[in-house]
């Protein structure tokens, strides 16, 4: 082995040792396990603004949630992260949410995504994965809906879809959000 080959091999080995333990994916996994990441996209400023409001409300009502906004470059990134279980919650326009749910249009490559609605207004929906814990859905919906009744939350005009949403061709509500909307109790202390 000549000097050039040795130095190349040594450099490659050193790079591998230093870089192999610093995958941002692992840091993302830890971050999302300790924070509620509300996804938004830079290509929809309305959803981004609403996501910021939601995160601020949730941080105030549920400080342990560590609620934060995670911005993707396009709404397709939200579909990618939610469909693969790398994220649980996102703010999406109603047409985009329905297209994600059905696996249509720009979301065909992700297939039909099992989404549920936590809260919605006229233009946007706070969507989550179907397997988002019922307790978390209940607490999140409770925080947002109760804030809406305050003076500074009046402009949010939020609602929870009814049980018949799926029959009407819409995305069904999350089980925890529906329990809150119907005034049913849910064990919010159990689970994770």
Where are these regions (language model features)?
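N-terminal export signals
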Residues: 5-25
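Short helix-initiation/N-cap motifs at beta->coil->alpha
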Residues: 63-80
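An extracytoplasmic/periplasmic, membrane-proximal ligand-sensing/linker region
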Residues: 152-192
């Amino acid at each position: 082995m000549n000097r050039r080959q040795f130095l190349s091999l040594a450099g490659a080995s050193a790079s591998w040792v230093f870089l192999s333990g610093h995958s941002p994916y692992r840091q993302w996994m830890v971050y999302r396990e300790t924070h509620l990441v509300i996804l938004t996209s830079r290509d929809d400023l309305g959803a981004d603004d609403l996501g910021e409001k939601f995160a601020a409300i949730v941080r105030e009502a549920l400080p342990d949630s560590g609620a934060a906004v995670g911005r993707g470059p396009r709404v397709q990134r939200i579909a990618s992260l939610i469909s693969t279980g790398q994220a649980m919650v996102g703010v999406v326009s109603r047409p985009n949410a329905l297209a994600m749910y059905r696996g249509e249009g720009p979301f065909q490559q992700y297939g039909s995504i099992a989404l549920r609605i936590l809260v919605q207004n006229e233009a946007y929906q706070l969507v989550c994965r179907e397997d988002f814990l019922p307790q978390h859905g209940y607490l999140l919906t409770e925080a947002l809906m109760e804030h809406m009744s305050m003076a500074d939350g009046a402009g949010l005009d939020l609602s929870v879809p009814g049980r018949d949403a799926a029959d009407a061709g819409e995305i069904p509500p999350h089980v925890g959000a529906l329990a809150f909307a119907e005034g049913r109790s849910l064990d919010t202390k159990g689970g994770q």
